[in-house]
Design a protein with these regions (language model features):
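Glycan-recognition surfaces
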Residues: 13-51, 55, 96-211
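Short intrinsically disordered, low-complexity coil segments enriched in acidic
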Residues: 1-6, 42
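Active-site beta-loop-alpha junctions enriched in small/polar residues
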Residues: 4-10, 73-75, 117-121
Length: 233
């Protein structure tokens, strides 16, 4: 439900997969296009928004993806002056209409795992997992941040299959120089949260110039194979 566009693009650029400009598709608050967290908020009930969603989901299905991360969904929960569907008057109604359309597209053909990020806790029925906090990296303070969120939000596993602690970075781009201890803490953080999604470059022939693929492999073989942590998970 986001458009990461500049203001001038709203009036001249067409939403992909539709015949509508960005200005036509976004909600208005006090008569002006509304933004949240730097992105314009799409009207979940607008046909242009729905056509855009249909196009994106079906493209990903054709490419063979089975996992789909849906970020900044909270932009679809912003109260507008009005909606394209005049029977809808609240942000929750609009969100439900837009996400119901999204799920109808996801349900066509092979199933997909839907991971929600920066998403309202409720309504909860549209995702398999939900990010328990915001972006979380590999330093010890980040693990503390994520575990604090788990301590306060553990009960959401009654609604979602998985509480997502974010991707678990061991080395990443190697800019932060995480220690093995920080790596162990972060992987344990993922295990107790209930979802482990590793995110490093493990290539045997890495030519990206980013991170340290050899170190990532060494750390992964040592830390991700920790029997005690894996049994707990």
């Amino acid at each position: 439900f986001c458009l990461w566009w500049n203001e001038d693009m709203l009036y001249r650029k067409i939403c992909e997969g539709s015949q509508y400009t960005g200005y036509e598709c976004v909600i208005k608050v006090n008569g002006k296009p509304a933004k949240l967290d730097g992105a314009y908020c799409l009207d979940p009930t607008h046909p242009g928004t729905k056509e855009f969603i249909s196009r994106e989901v079906q493209n990903k299905k054709k490419e063979g993806f089975e996992y789909l991360k849906v970020d900044f969904t909270s932009n679809g929960m912003v109260q507008a002056d009005s909606y394209y569907n005049k029977d809808v008057t609240t942000a929750v109604e609009a969100y439900n209409e837009g996400f119901s359309h999204f799920i109808s597209e996801v349900d066509k053909g092979e199933p997909m795992f839907i991971a929600l990020s920066i998403a309202p806790i409720f309504p909860y029925q549209y995702g398999n997992s939900r990010r328990i906090a915001c972006d979380t990296w590999g330093k010890i303070g980040q693990s503390e941040y994520s575990l604090n969120a788990v301590s306060g939000g553990w009960w959401t596993n009654e609604f979602y299959q998985y509480n997502d602690p974010d991707h678990l970075v061991l080395v990443g781009n190697d800019a932060d120089k995480e220690t093995e201890g920080e790596n162990r803490a972060r992987i344990t953080n993922g295990a107790v949260s209930g979802m482990v999604l590793v995110s490093d470059n493990y290539s045997l022939e890495d030519k990206s110039g980013r991170g340290d693929a050899k170190l990532s492999r060494e750390r992964a073989q040592k830390i991700l194979m920790n029997k005690d942590v894996n049994e707990m998970a």
